[in-house]
């Protein structure tokens, strides 16, 4: 049994507080894009085995998809073993939820495969034990995510918007970025409610001009190349560009496929991980 595990971008990311346990309270708009891993799950006699086409991806308990299989087996007392194969296309440590979306895919497949058939809401609660992005990845589409990311409210779909996605040649630790984030230094917060109403109006110009990610305050300061990529995408004719999640990936929206194609070709001369895709 296999499914596509889609990457996500943030249309906005606001930090509104901090819990006693150190987790930040967020208000963010998440959006799936047509860039995906293919996650295959099969029954085997015992244990958990994981294989991936990218050698740098861990295939043991460090892998979130492996952890997802283990959690599901333990929660629902599954005796059968599990074989997971991941065809990885989403860059890792990129701010695109590559690990979370694979974990979500494993939970969704196992729920069907073993006829457990828990509700999406229950599956999302289980996914939260693996990471804050996993509940959204189970739900998908266009959504407002609050709390630490676990409170997911579906929004009107914001589909078929063209974007170019560029990841610089390094990864970023989400944990480290949040650790360095200082809420007291924030002056302007994202206009989340206005962004939501303009998603409903399908207003790509407003979205592109007003999308905001507070984690840029940390990551852009550490890596000048991210600002450079944003500028390069804008020069190519993007309606606007922004870093996704904790970074370092940058995306830009385009209203014209020809401009996007030219931008893709230009970026591909300098960077390895470049994609031309759409919102879904």
Curated annotation (Swiss-Prot):
It comes from the Bacteria. The keyword Nucleotide-binding applies. The active site is at 8, 133. Keywords: ATP-binding, Isoprene biosynthesis, Kinase, Nucleotide-binding, Transferase. One of its GO terms (biological process) is terpenoid biosynthetic process. ATP binds at residues 91-101. Pathway: Isoprenoid biosynthesis; isopentenyl diphosphate biosynthesis via DXP pathway; isopentenyl diphosphate from 1-deoxy-D-xylulose 5-phosphate: step 3/6. GO terms for molecular function: 4-(cytidine 5'-diphospho)-2-C-methyl-D-erythritol kinase activity; ATP binding. The keyword Glycoprotein does not apply. SUPFAM superfamilies: GHMP Kinase, C-terminal domain, Ribosomal protein S5 domain 2-like. It is an enzyme of class 2 (transferase). InterPro entries: GHMP_kinase_C_dom, GHMP_kinase_C_sf, GHMP_kinase_N_dom, IspE, Ribosomal_Su5_D2-typ_SF, Ribsml_uS5_D2-typ_fold_subgr. It catalyses: 4-CDP-2-C-methyl-D-erythritol + ATP = 4-CDP-2-C-methyl-D-erythritol 2-phosphate + ADP + H(+). Its EC number is 2.7.1.148. Catalyzes the phosphorylation of the position 2 hydroxy group of 4-diphosphocytidyl-2C-methyl-D-erythritol. Belongs to the GHMP kinase family. IspE subfamily. This is 4-diphosphocytidyl-2-C-methyl-D-erythritol kinase. It comes from Clostridium botulinum (strain Alaska E43 / Type E3).
């Amino acid at each position: 049994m296999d499914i596509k595990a889609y990457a996500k971008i943030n249309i906005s990311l606001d930090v509104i507080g901090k819990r006693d346990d150190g987790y930040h309270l967020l208000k963010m708009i998440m959006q799936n894009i047509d860039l995906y891993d293919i996650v295959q799950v099969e029954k085997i006699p015992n244990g958990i085995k994981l294989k991936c086409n990218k050698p740098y991806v861990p295939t043991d308990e460090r892998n979130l998809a492996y952890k997802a299989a283990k959690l599901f087996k333990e929660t629902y007392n599954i005796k059968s073993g599990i074989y997971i194969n991941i065809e990885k296309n989403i860059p890792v440590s990129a701010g695109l939820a590559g690990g979370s979306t694979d974990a979500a895919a494993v939970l969704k497949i196992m729920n069907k495969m073993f006829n457990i058939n828990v509700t999406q809401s229950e599956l999302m609660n289980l996914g939260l034990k693996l990471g804050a992005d996993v509940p959204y990845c189970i739900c998908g589409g266009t959504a407002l995510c609050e709390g630490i990311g676990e409170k997911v409210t579906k929004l009107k779909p914001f589909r078929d918007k063209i974007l170019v996605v560029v990841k610089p040649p390094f990864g970023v630790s989400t944990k480290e970025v949040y650790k360095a984030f200082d809420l007291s230094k924030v002056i302007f917060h994202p206009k989340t409610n206005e962004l939501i109403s303009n998603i409903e109006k399908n207003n790509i110009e407003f979205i592109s001009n007003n999308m905001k990610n507070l984690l840029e305050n940390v990551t852009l300061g550490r890596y000048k190349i991210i600002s450079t990529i944003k500028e390069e995408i804008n020069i190519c004719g993007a309606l606007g560009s922004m870093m996704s999640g904790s970074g370092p990936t940058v995306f830009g929206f385009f209203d014209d496929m020809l401009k996007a194609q030219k931008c893709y070709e230009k970026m591909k001369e300098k960077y390895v991980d470049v994609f031309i895709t759409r919102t879904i």
